[in-house]
C-alpha cells in the first residue's frame, strides 16, 4: 500500500542495481548514493529523486536504507568531576549530520575504493566548514557528533580504561539501529595504509566506567568521530580462541537462493546479506587467526586473515571476515615487490571469484511477489534473479576467463589463444566445448606454467598447517560429440514395427554412446551444441557391439551406420555429410575394437547373447557360459562365410538344448491362457462344466441390472477390455466389482471377445453344415426338432456353456422394453460369434443370415431345447 512521506527523508543506496524504464531511460544506482524519498509506492518499490528538481524514479526498497531524520543538537552537559566512588555516567546525546568526503593534501578525494567505501576515514584535518547538512551532491556518510567530550585514545586498551559508551537504549532509539547489534556495528577502524598514530574512536557498550575529567581545551575542541555505513561494518576485536562462540544477533533470517539452492542469511534491520553463517565460525578455515602479515608483509595489521582452499580451482586464497577482502596466494607474492601497490590493494576479486557475488535479496525466494511491483516508470529488465552466475569457476593457471554477450564463460589460452566455452548438462555438471573443431571435454586442457617461487614465503608460513591436497579425479575426455539422426529398429531382440528418425545430440565417451532426446534447436548439419542437454534417451555400450554400413534394405537414406549392441538392440545412425559420418564410423569402430580386445575368447560352440538378441537363457545354461563376441563379425568382411557357418552351428546346438513345451509347463514357466484356450481344456483345467470367467461375467451383468440400454449391443472401451483380458490371463483371482470394470459394457464386450477367441466356436466346425441344413427346412416343427437334436449332440462343455448363455440371453430379452434388445437384435450380435464355418465360403452374406436364424430359433425354443432339471 502506498504511503506518503512527511518531511525530508533520505535513503542510502546499499547495493548496485540498474534497469530500463518504459521510456528507455537507464536507471542505475551505486552504493553510498543518497536520494530523497518521495513516496513508498509499494512494499518493494519506493519513489525517490536524486537532485532537487530532478526527474524521480523507482528503486527497490530492499536495496536502500532509510536514513534517520535530523534533529536539533542537544546541548552538551558539563563534565563531571571524578568522585571517590563509581557513579552512573550521563547518557550521551547525538545529532546526525551528513558530511562530504574530506579532500587529501594532493587535492584528490580520500574516499576509499571497493568495499573500503563502507569504512570511515580518519578524523583529522576536519573543520566545521567541511560538513554539509543533507547536501544533495555529497556522499551519504553518517556523522555523529557526541555532545560529551571524548578523549583521544592511542590504543584499544587505553580506550577501554577511560572510554565511555553510549547506553544501548540511546542507540536503539534511532529507529534503524538495535541494541542487540550495536556491538557488531558501531565501529570506526583505520584503513590498512594509515599510521598507528591515528586516533581510534569506538563506542563499546559493554563498558560502564565513569568518564574522566577533561581539560577545557579538550572540551572546547573535541575530536569528532565519523561513522559511515555503521550497520554493515563488523567490530574490530582482538583475536579470540577458536572455541569462543561468536556474538549472536537475533535478527538474522535464513533464505534460499532460487538459482543455486544455497542458503544465505539476511538481516532485515540492516539490509545485509551474506553467504557465511553468522551463527558459527567459517568452515574450512585451517588457521582463522593467521595474521595477514604471514602472507608476505612484515607489518602488523589490524585485521585477521583466514586461509582457505578452493575446491574447484585447487588454489589457496586468504579471506578477511572483517572487511570481506579475498586475495589469492599467488597474488600476495606479486604484491611483495611493490609495497605501494600492496597498501592500495582493494578488497575485490575477479567477477567470477568465490565469495564475491552478493547474495540476492529475499524477493528472489518469492518470485510471485514481483507481480505487485508498480507499473509506472520501470521495466524490470534487471530483476533480482538476473544477478549473473552465482558459482562460476576460477580460471585455471594459464587461462583467462571472460563473459560473452550470450552470457557464456569463454576461457582463452594465454599462450596459444585457444578458446573453450563452458557449458552445463541437465544435471548441472560443467563441460567445455571448442567452437573451432566441435570437440568436447570435461576439463580444460592443462597448460604448463612455471613453478611458483618458494623462496618468497614468510617464515610464519611454517606455523600454518599444511593444506591437504584434493583427491585426484580421473579426467574423462569425450571422444566425439555432435548432432546425428538416429532410430532404433530392434529392442533387445524384438524388432520394432516403425522407424522414427530423430535428430539428437550424440556423445561418445569412454566406450559408451549416448543419444539425448530431441534437440529442438539443433539441426543435423549444425555445428553448435545445445546450451543445455536434455535427458539421455538411449545409452549403447560399445563393449561387445558391432558396427557396419547399413544395407539398402534397412534404410533408403544415404550414409547410414548400423550399430548392434551386446543385448541384441540395433540402431541406425545417419548424417547427410559423408565426411562427418565417416569420422563417427572411425571413432565408434576404434572404441569397439579397443574394448573388444580386452574380452576373453569364447570356446567354439558357446552361445552368445549378441547372437540370439537376449541374455535370457533356458535349460541348463550357466550365467558364466555366455560371453560377448571377441570381435565383431561385420568388421571383417573376408570371414563372413565362416561366421555364417558358425552361427548355424550355434543355432542348431541351441535348438537341440531347448527344453520341450511340456517341461516348461510342468515347471510353471508357461501357463495356458483363458482367452484363446480350447473350451474342453479350459473346463478340464478348471474342473468346471462351464468356464469360471463366463459364470462371473453373467452373474455380474445380471447383478448390475438387465434394463441397461443397448446391453450386448453397445461396445465398451477397447483398451479397458484388453486390460481385463490381460488380468484374466495372468491372475487367477479376478474381481469384476473392482472400480476399473464399473462399466457393464466392458464386461459384456469381454464376454463376447472370449467366445470370438475360442479356437473352435461354441457350435463346433463339425456341426456347422448340419445346423445350416436344419434351418433351411420348410416345416417349422421338423426344423425345431432337428435343431434340438443337434444341440443335444454337442460335446458336454459346449452344451453346458451354451445352456448357461442362452438362458441368460433370454432373461435379457425379457427386459427388452428397457434395454431395447429384442430376439432379432440378440441373434444378430451372437450369431456370427457362436456359429461360423471353418473355411470362409463364397456366399458369406447368405451364410450370416442362416447363422442368425439358428441362434434366433434356439432363443425362441429355449425351454424346449434346454428343459429345466
From Swiss-Prot:
GO terms for molecular function: GTPase activator activity; SH3 domain binding. Residues 246-280, 299-333, 414-447 form the WW domain. The lineage of its organism: Eukaryota, Metazoa, Chordata, Craniata, Vertebrata. Residues 104-137, 275-299, 331-389, 447-474, 598-644 are annotated as: Disordered. Pfam families: PH, RhoGAP, WW. The modification Phosphoserine is found at residues 155, 215, 249, 350, 459, 462, 469, 632. This is Rho GTPase-activating protein 27. Residues 677-866 form the Rho-GAP domain. The gene is Arhgap27. GO terms for biological process: receptor-mediated endocytosis; Rho protein signal transduction; small GTPase-mediated signal transduction. The modification Phosphothreonine is found at residue 464. It is a peripheral membrane protein. Residues 477-593 form the PH domain. The keyword Oxidoreductase does not apply. Keywords: Cytoplasm, Endocytosis, GTPase activation, Membrane, Phosphoprotein, Repeat, SH3 domain. The record marks 713 as: Arginine finger. Interacts with SH3KBP1/CIN85. Gene3D superfamilies: 2.20.70.10, Pleckstrin-homology domain (PH domain)/Phosphotyrosine-binding domain (PTB), Rho GTPase activation protein, SH3 Domains.
